[in-house]
């Protein structure tokens, strides 16, 4: 993020990586690293990250991604069983000065939100990453907890993740009434079977914004990337 005449610029990526399992059924962390690096994002919110699970070769995907991409990082284990973990991660070019994990429940698997405060020069920005449940009944219980967390965030803040809902869902309309959705320039699904379910929102007035889907076969989701510009005094 650069400051010129009090205008900041940040590129954000959100990506459900499905533990690196591509559309060809193969799990490959190397090509996932290449996919993320190609976006040249300042901040990356990841969902579906494995740590030490057999299905992904017992790799610590979180640590490997952070190391190979040379980014600051934090992790929230939505599922935590012995040494096996699965959850959300935030990667950042900027130092992470604090983080908070909130568990929001789930009938099939537990879900979480991961909030990180990033230090950018003398300023800071909050990023919240989440992955909501697949079924409507799950999300109806999770969304009020998420709303409570969002209401406590100061400006400027960004929320990104896999919401498992398109924008016409009543629950998403609630969020869109309070936060600004960064609309996709190339309208297309972010997951072929479910539609546009991966989103990026902000709570500050934006000078300029654009978002797009990056074509990819590295996961069953596509990366969503947003370019944001806002004024420091907002």
What are these regions (language model features)?
Residues 1-43, 52, 67-68, 72-75, ...:
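Active-site regions of metal-assisted phosphoester/phosphodiester hydrolases
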Residues 49:
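Short strand-turn motif at the edge of the Rossmann-like AdoMet-binding core
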Residues 53-59:
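Short, flexible/disordered intra-domain loops and linkers
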Residues 59-62, 169:
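Short, surface-exposed alpha-helical segments at coil->helix boundaries
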């Amino acid at each position: 993020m650069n400051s010129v005449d009090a205008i900041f610029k940040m590129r954000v990526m959100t990506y459900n990586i499905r533990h690196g399992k591509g559309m060809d059924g193969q799990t490959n962390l190397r090509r996932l690293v290449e996919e993320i690096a190609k976006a040249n994002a300042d901040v990356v919110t990841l969902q579906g990250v494995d740590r030490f699970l057999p299905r992904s070769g017992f790799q610590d995907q979180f640590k490997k991604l952070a190391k190979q991409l040379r980014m600051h990082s934090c992790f929230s284990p939505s599922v935590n069983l012995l040494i096996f973990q699965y959850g959300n991660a935030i990667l950042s070019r900027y130092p992470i000065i604090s983080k908070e994990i909130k568990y929001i429940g789930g009938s099939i698997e537990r879900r979480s939100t991961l909030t990180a405060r990033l230090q950018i020069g003398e300023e800071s920005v909050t990023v919240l990453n989440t992955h909501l449940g697949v079924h409507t009944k799950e999300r109806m219980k999770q969304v009020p907890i998420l709303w409570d967390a969002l209401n406590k965030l100061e400006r400027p803040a960004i929320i990104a993740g896999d919401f498992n809902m398109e924008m016409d869902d009543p629950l998403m309309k609630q969020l869109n009434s309070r936060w600004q959705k960064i609309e996709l320039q190339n309208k297309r699904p972010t997951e072929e079977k479910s539609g546009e379910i991966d989103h990026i929102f902000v709570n500050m007035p934006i000078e300029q914004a654009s978002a797009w889907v990056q074509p990819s076969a590295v996961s069953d989701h596509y990366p969503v990337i947003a370019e944001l510009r806002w004024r420091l005094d907002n």
